[in-house]
């Protein structure tokens, strides 16, 4: 007869007949559960901080897989001391992780409208994590179900195993590839590997289920909020190359899969965990050999300092250059001081063949004041960009700067409709004629009774031409859904715009100011860069270079501009296109097709960027199949999660007559 397992707690009938014993045991049980719940929630909060650390400007890409791993560990059973949490607790754990991430990631929302919108949006975004947490609990249970079925052992082996408990225990601590456990039935050898169930429900199920939840968050309601996608935190790591295959969706799945691998390592299943964790970044890193960044630029920076700041400005200019200038080993940096204006010039030139290259100039005119009220000085903003362009024209005339093919102004660089205001029209025309090349102007237009956020091509000879009306509008900013309802919570709803979306593919054709050739430019205005459809439609429409005109002045010195820049970098890699970011107050940037930033400005400064960039008509795998890959992975995640939940339904008891 096998030796019965000693009971650590009294039987229910013993507790029932012992005064106070049952209550004491129950209170101890509740205390232990509460303690482990607090530990799990604390671990989830730290996981949220790790995920936040992966986003720009922090750029700690490896922190995201670590954060996902900590979240999965918080949802796992911790031996006999703390069994796996239920679905409700799992949902709360994931909600905690999401809330901490978004509270740290989105404070720019409330920069000038108060903390209520920031906190409310963070809570709404974290609500989607409830589904991920509950689903992951079911997936983990289904994955570990096979491990609960232990093999039978003979009584003789059982007694032998019990009599040699100390020896077996010491043997199991020597790092072998298997684990010897003692149970009431004897010694059981548990191999350090993962079962087919675990591979399906954990390695495949958890990453794809995460993507499915992220997909819902990015599309619903009001068009979704794609700003919080996990992939945006991977632009500084090797996983970025996966964008050319499956876009942000594949990067998200790869990131979560690495987190699953780290969680498996935590369970001391070494080899499978290491393989899952390392194979993805290694393969992605090797894929960079297939990524063509285009010609290597040699860079020149020329700083022009304000008249009233001779010494102080020159010191600041040197510091600014150190931060703004990013170049490869072949780059050279040349600094010159001039007192002709307060504009900082950055130029990236190329000495290779001019074939399929285009020269672009970006004007960052800055805004007269920080905050929402800068729109009250609409003409001052327009004047800033006109004056900066006139300064550029003088440099071109004096052969200090190369003549560009076209110039890009930011979103809202003219908050006055030039089609209705003759003075605004004259100022833009003056700038275009002085530069002698077309300008992409971000402005407001009013077709019919609508108001639209527009980027229009302004030719020095023919005036306004093709235009892109912003398709993906920012809810609660550019338009206000349910305005009457939300007015009960904040009076700031009346500050939201009333824009109407456009319906074009985002491609405008710009006549080169040097060759007269038409250049197809894909435009993604500000918020649009976060959405897959914006540049996807532009590439399908023949865009050979991207531009992202944006207005971030409302968000001050927060991380918003750097977060948006990360999205532009990922889009460059995804579609193999150079991207020009033009911001009213920064950060403006030149992005190579490999996602590398060759030049950028600082926030709330005046500056001009020059760059010679490649035009490309080839298409990546992602441009054909990213949508199909995303839908397939999302569908797989939903099916596997539902299968895990259904497989654990408790059988109904049949009442005996």
Feature names for model-found ranges:
Residues 80, 140, 267, 397-400, ...:
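Residue-level signal for alpha-helix termini/capping positions
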Residues 288-312, 317, 321-476, 497, ...:
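Soluble catalytic regions of membrane-associated enzymes that act on cell-envelope
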Residues 205, 442, 458, 591-592:
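Short hydrophobic alpha-helical segments used for membrane anchoring or interfacial signaling
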Residues 112, 116, 125-129, 152-155, ...:
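CN hydrolase (nitrilase-like) catalytic-core segments centered on the catalytic cysteine
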Residues 109-116, 143, 182, 218-246, ...:
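Active-site catalytic loop in hydrolytic enzyme cores
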Residues 653-657:
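Cytoplasmic C-terminal tails of single-pass
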Residues 2-168, 173-311, 328, 338, ...:
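Membrane-embedded alpha-helical bundles of multi-pass enzymes
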Residues 57-72, 101-104, 364-365, 401-416, ...:
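Short, conserved active-site loops that position catalytic residues or coordinate cofactors/metal ions
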């Amino acid at each position: 007869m096998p030796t019965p397992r000693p009971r650590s707690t009294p039987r229910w009938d013993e507790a029932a007949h012992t005064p106070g014993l049952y209550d004491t045991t129950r209170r101890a049980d509740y205390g232990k559960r509460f303690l482990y719940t607090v530990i799990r929630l604390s671990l989830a909060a730290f996981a949220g901080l790790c995920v936040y650390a992966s986003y720009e400007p922090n750029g700690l890409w490896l922190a995201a897989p670590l954060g996902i791993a900590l979240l999965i560990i918080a949802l796992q059973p911790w031996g006999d001391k703390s069994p796996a949490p239920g679905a409700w607790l799992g949902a709360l754990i994931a909600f905690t992780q999401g809330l901490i991430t978004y509270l740290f990631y989105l404070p720019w929302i409330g920069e000038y409208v108060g903390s209520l919108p920031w906190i409310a949006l963070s809570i709404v975004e974290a609500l989607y994590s409830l589904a991920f947490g509950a689903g992951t609990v079911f997936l983990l249970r289904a994955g570990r179900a096979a491990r609960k079925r232990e093999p039978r052992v003979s009584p003789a082996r059982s007694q032998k195993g019990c009599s040699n408990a100390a020896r077996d225990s010491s043997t199991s601590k020597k790092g072998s590839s298997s684990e010897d456990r003692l149970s009431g039935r004897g010694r059981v050898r548990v191999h350090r590997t993962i079962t087919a169930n675990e591979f399906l429900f954990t390695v495949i199920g958890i990453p794809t289920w995460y993507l499915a939840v992220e997909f819902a968050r990015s599309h619903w309601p009001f068009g979704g909020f794609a700003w919080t996608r996990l992939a945006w935190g991977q632009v500084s790591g090797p996983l970025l190359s996966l964008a050319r295959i499956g876009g942000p969706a594949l990067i998200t799945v790869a990131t979560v899969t690495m987190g699953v691998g780290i969680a498996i390592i935590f369970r001391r299943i070494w080899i499978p965990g290491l393989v899952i964790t390392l194979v993805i970044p290694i393969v992605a890193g090797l894929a960079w050999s297939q990524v063509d960044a285009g010609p290597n630029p040699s860079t020149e920076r020329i700083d022009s300092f304000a008249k009233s700041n001779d010494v102080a400005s020159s010191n600041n200019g040197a510091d600014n250059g150190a931060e703004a200038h990013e170049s490869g080993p072949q780059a050279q940096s040349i600094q010159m001081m001039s007192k002709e204006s307060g504009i900082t010039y950055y130029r990236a030139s190329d000495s290779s063949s001019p074939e399929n290259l285009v020269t672009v100039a970006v004007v960052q005119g800055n805004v007269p004041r920080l905050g929402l009220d800068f729109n009250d000085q609409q003409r001052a903003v327009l004047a800033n960009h006109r004056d900066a362009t006139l300064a550029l024209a003088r440099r071109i005339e004096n052969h200090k700067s190369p003549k560009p093919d076209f110039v890009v102004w930011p979103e809202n660089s003219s908050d006055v409709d030039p089609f209705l205001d003759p003075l605004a029209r004259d100022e833009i025309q003056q700038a275009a004629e002085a530069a002698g090349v077309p300008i992409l102007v971000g402005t407001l237009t009013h077709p019919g009774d609508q108001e639209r956020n527009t980027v229009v091509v302004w030719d020095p000879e023919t005036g306004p031409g093709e235009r892109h009306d912003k398709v993906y509008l920012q809810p609660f900013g550019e338009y206000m859904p349910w305005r009457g309802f939300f007015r009960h919570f904040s009076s700031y709803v009346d500050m939201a715009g009333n824009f109407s979306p456009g319906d074009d593919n985002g491609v405008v054709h710009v006549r080169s100011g040097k060759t007269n050739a038409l250049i197809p430019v894909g435009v993604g205005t500000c918020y649009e860069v976060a959405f897959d459809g914006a540049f996807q439609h532009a590439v399908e429409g023949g865009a050979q270079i991207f531009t992202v005109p944006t207005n971030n002045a409302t968000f001050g010195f927060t991380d918003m501009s750097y977060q948006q820049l990360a999205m532009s970098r990922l889009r460059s890699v995804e579609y193999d296109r150079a991207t020009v970011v033009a911001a009213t107050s920064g950060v403006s940037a030149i992005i190579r097709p490999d996602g590398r930033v060759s030049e950028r400005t600082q926030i709330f400064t005046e500056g001009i960027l020059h760059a010679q960039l490649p035009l490309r008509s080839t298409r990546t795998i992602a441009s054909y199949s990213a949508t199909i890959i995303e839908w397939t992975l999302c569908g797989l995640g939903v099916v596997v999660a539902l299968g895990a939940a259904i497989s654990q339904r408790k059988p109904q008891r049949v009442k005996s007559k």
